[in-house]
């Protein structure tokens, strides 16, 4: 029989030894094959930047303030988390220890983030903690304030630098993105209380109401590296950041909660997402010690959540974003506004002057406002709804009941904060959140009555589009 020169002969013993060696090699290679076949479903990166003004500035949140800031009690921060799924789809979350999100800031940051990093506007969320101890972000002559030119300049310079910092942070978080896992958990926290109380005369006053609706849930998203090192902890709560009312910059209870969580978890970036807290206040309030106590309480609730059985979040990122025209109830005539200018109520008269100035400058008053609604699907289980404005608690309670899926997280103060967003119940009742607060801005009137149905219907449509 002819043999090929390349085909060696082997004894039975040699054949057995070769087979054993082959089996060992395959066994050693199995972990590598397993990792390659089941790579981490996420990549993630997070960064934090101090945004406390270097100089005194006028502060946002309370119309009664008569002077600029007088120092810093607790630094303010902006933070960014970027998630990338296994298909390369990206989501960027930005949180800020500030009063709100101006529409112009959202538009500018979204445009730059898409151009520079390929993150679509629908996949960007910007949330404000709504602290009333931060700088004002927008001031114009329409507001009729003292030192208007200086305040316009300061607010404009601060906001322009903030926009640059937010874009930079998203880029840095994306550049840091590394293989990660994401887990969801939750607990509860009890210092928020409904602040709408009947005044006994058919109206409503701002006063703690222990019988009013609340949302005490504390949703938590933990992002960890594949080595188990925690990278970011995102947590939410539905409560106004109004423990404090002084003249020093501070993130209020939300700032203290983030500070405590980061101390408990070295290397972590803690990001706070305010919920549907338009009618929710922290109680008791008005002292620094109480702000610290509430912050510690919320941080403890986050620790309690992390100690429960967490739910792994796996899958892809899907997002939908729409601006819907929220109609105003009615548009005042020039004659009506001139009459209101003579009102003995200072704020009614001031509002009339602002709206008249707007009418003179723009030629007409808008019939509606472009209101942002965003729905995110993070993995297969988490539906995250973000709504603009100071949304009252009824929205998170209703959407939690009516949306499908095991996890529904609803955040307010996102992508634009233009005023209070009442539910139908609150609109019917009236009062501050029902429309009375509009006198402190430049909206021509309160919203039309079907605002809740319009928003909820849009949320459901967007959620269905992501199936």
Predicted segment positions?
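Conserved beta-alpha junction segments in alpha/beta enzyme cores
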Residues: 37-127, 131-269, 273-277, 283-293, ...
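Bacterial N-terminal signal peptides
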Residues: 21-32
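Anionic-ligand-binding alpha/beta catalytic cores of soluble enzymes and soluble regulatory domains
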Residues: 298
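Short, Lys/Arg-enriched N-terminal segments with co-localized hydrophobic residues
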Residues: 7-16
